[in-house]
Amino acid sequence: MCGIVGYIGDREAADFLMDGLAKLEYRGYDSAGIAVYHDGAIAVRKKAGRLVNLAEAVKAHPVVGTVGIGHTRWATHGGPSDVNAHPHTDEKGDFAIVHNGIIENYMELKEELLKKGYHFKSETDTEVVAHLCADMYDGDFTSTVRKVLSRLRGSYSLVFMCKFEPDKIICSKKDNPLIVGLGQGENYIASDIPAILSYTRKTYIMNDGEIAIVMKDNVWVTDLEGKPISKKVFEVNWDAEAAEKGGFEHFMLKEIYEQPKAIKDTMSCRITKDGKHVHFEELNWTPEDVNSIGKIMITACGTAYHAGLLAKYFIEKLARIPVEVDIASEYRYRDPLTDSKTLCIVVSQSGETIDTLAALKEAKRRGARSLAITNVVGSSISREADQVAYTWAGPEIAVASTKAYTTQLVTLLLLSLYMGRLNGNLSVEREEKILADLTKLPDQCQGVFDQVDTIKGLCDAFKNKEDVFFIGRSMDYGLAMEGALKLKEISYIHAESYAGGELKHGTLSLIEAGVPVIALATQVEVEEKMISNIKEVKARDAYVVGVVQEGDTEVGKTVDALIKVPASDDFVIPILAIIPLQLLAYYIAVSRGNDVDKPRNLAKSVTVE
């Protein structure tokens, strides 16, 4: 959740640090700070609030030097304040630390240090690490860091500076992402790729239990005992311009409009040239591989969880394999029936979602095979899973996921077709029909974009409301859940989703005159029942917006407003029908004056439990 940057070289460190932190704003934060070494001392500037507050502090009191670290903080221990912001130092200012994660035994360590006479300024767990460095310093910076790490329990990405050895920065990680960027006469540290993408594409992806000693001309990597580790250079293939707004007002809007390309890139390498079959070269499964699967367990969080709910329909209907879908943070606590015949599919945009990573490790511990669906090559989840199928969405910067979600659905639908053909449960004709419609998706997205004025026109009916309800049946129910999440996370309007058939089991008591209801009715087999549900809420004077396929003639008779999406196969239409809901959420949030890319209290990548 927090953002970390580090620099050592010949340029002014503060310039890089501020630029890198700006590129990590999407991760979510409530305070920010930098520390720069110069002339025998470490100068620290930190401020609560947005990065502009830190920029003003640095402008008022410049920091000069070519070695430094920076941080955007998301409060876990201690509220947002200047004093709780990172970097943290020991009392003498000999060490400076930035940290992402949670030190679980910090109270135990703090009590030990208090007894020795150390004084603490902040409420954070991180300050303990700075004092521990001072307490354990043995005249050798690297040796001290190793000893400090041996005392810590929990999850962390940690970056250390020491004024006694300003020619190096040291970093290490456990269960939180960290990369080292390799430059010419300068090197970089970051928690995520966008921070360094305009400076270098060559990186070391740090693994748990590794320590990197980063100097301006060299990077040495060892294990916790000091044994050298040979690291392979990972070259980032992202387009640097893809991590910029490119003329759009917000990253979210840009990423909505990037979906045609993202969808095309994700499926083009997995559909045969004749367009009739699916093949995952990276999996290369055999019929025996698929037939040995007793059940599939999908685990994910947030938007990725909603993709998993739709995947349950895809897989069970097309491949006839039973599927369970778990919220990752709950999976470990229900003693799941997982064994060697279970395929665990984990879905995560960032590949760093801590709860999903923990669920993956637990499933593997119980003997399950594992497959990751993620957007980030080299991420923790991609390295932990047995196999990986990447969504080629490119960088997604906005907190509210859009193109990552649609490419997850595309990947999961293709995977369902792949398994169904291999185990003999899917006919050639059915596969060809779905693929024919799927390959039309990039062009059909334009049909949704053409309705943007209609979607904008609906904002007045929503922007001042306290509640919005989304209803749907079958695959539309999973879609309703994602639509409600999009609206609530960026507009701050309370939004809930319900299966259409559940209205009469309690939800109807909340429907009254003028309450907006978005009724998803794209699934042909349940349309009649959805119309009955729409009539139920209309009878209570709700304001109903229907979402239907083009050519539908029935739903429009019962709703107040209609959004039409190009007609497609029932398995494909959910991928298309989410786009108007993304646009609606976006324009409602904009009309309310909200910071769409960085909604309050939320982070892009949730890396603490």
Language model region names:
Residues 70-83, 274-287, 311-347, 494-510:
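Glycine-rich oxoanion-binding loops at beta->alpha junctions
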Residues 7-10, 99, 119, 135-138, ...:
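Hydrophobic alpha-helical scaffolding
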Residues 291-440, 520-561, 584, 592:
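Glycine-rich phosphate-binding loops that contact phosphosugars or nucleotide phosphates
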Residues 252, 543, 556-558, 564, ...:
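Generic C-terminus detector
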Residues 259-263, 267-297, 377, 387-516, ...:
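Active-site phosphate/pyrophosphate-binding segments
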Residues 1-250, 261-294, 333, 428, ...:
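Conserved short alpha-helical segments that host acidic/polar catalytic motifs at enzyme active sites
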